[in-house]
Design a protein with these regions (language model features):
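Short, flexible active-site-proximal loops enriched in glycine and acidic residues
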Residues: 50-52, 90-100
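Short, Lys/Arg-enriched, disordered terminal segments
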Residues: 1-4, 161
Length: 161
């Protein structure tokens, strides 16, 4: 059962898939339809799942699952990863590459590979106050306080040495 993102519980499990390229408005419409179709058929051991999704900043696909009603099984998570891989192929983007790092400078979002991110740190274009996206969070409640955070408070800080 699909619900609005703001209606799903704060303790819902989330998955964040970050694109290495900005999605256009036309692409977002198509992607939202694809996500809707996938979520309508997404089950765990035959049980319907209470789910929600959103696309944030034209880069991030966020899928939420209310685990109070049903838990995702390994097979259901595999189906989601397969779905995400299909989106990668269809739109020519990377959504599963955890070595792409996203950050904000002057409210503009940038995506860099790990090497470029480290180079920007050395060039002093990125510092401890730079806002980074911690896509490793896994609860909806963490989107508010733990997703967009200063580099100094994220796992990314280990890259500054």
């Amino acid at each position: 059962m699909i619900v609005r993102f703001d209606e799903i519980s704060d303790d819902a499990r989330i998955w964040i898939y970050q694109s290495n390229k900005l999605f256009s408005n036309d692409q977002i419409k198509i992607i939202k339809n694809r996500i809707q179709d996938f979520l309508n058929s997404w089950t765990s051991h035959g049980n319907e799942l209470k789910v929600a999704s959103k696309i944030k900043y034209c880069y991030f696909i966020i899928i939420a699952l209310d685990q109070n009603t049903s838990l995702a099984s390994g097979c259901s998570i595999d189906k989601m990863v397969h779905f995400i891989k299909n989106l990668e192929n269809e739109f020519g983007v990377r959504l599963l590459d955890r070595l792409d790092i996203s950050y904000k400078i002057n409210n503009e979002i940038f995506i860099s590979n790990l090497k470029d991110f480290k180079d920007k740190i050395l060039e002093k274009k990125i510092d401890n106050t730079t806002i980074v996206f911690n896509n490793l969070i896994n609860l909806k409640s963490d989107l508010t306080n733990c997703w967009e955070i200063p580099l100094s408070k994220s796992w990314h800080k280990q890259l500054i040495k």
